[in-house]
């Protein structure tokens, strides 16, 4: 064979190999039972946690190509439970989640970063009370038949108008709220 033919053929083969690698096949997952989404903060120095009763998660992810990953979470704010009825009613009210007007929040991220091992970060956007702000989620990916995504983020509540009015005082309720999740996933068939 002539070297004139081999050079274009090798170039084409290299391009096909590069394109095949760039178009990685991320697996698609949806949330399975057993998933949790909780937050922790304090009021007058007393720490408390709350659990979001309903949230739905969709993930597209290939650990070999985290830059192609996507995450979509829809969080139902009605029914948030802290174990204290008065506090739960206050959180549902206009000064906090304002569930009458904003019944849900969303978090979306496109393109994850590897932090080494099974650790990743997702620079995403949280929309809460009609306000969208960047929020970084760091997470551990545990592969398997039902992989898990266990993550943590810090949300600045005042950036979203959560805890307005008399509740703006950060000596009573800190601005930073810790959010953690463990999402059990199942593959989309």
Show the residue positions of the predicted features.
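Bacterial N-terminal signal peptides that target proteins for export
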Residues: 1-11
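N-terminal targeting/secretion presequences
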Residues: 2-3, 21-25
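Low-complexity, acidic/polar, glycine-enriched regions of mature
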Residues: 24-189
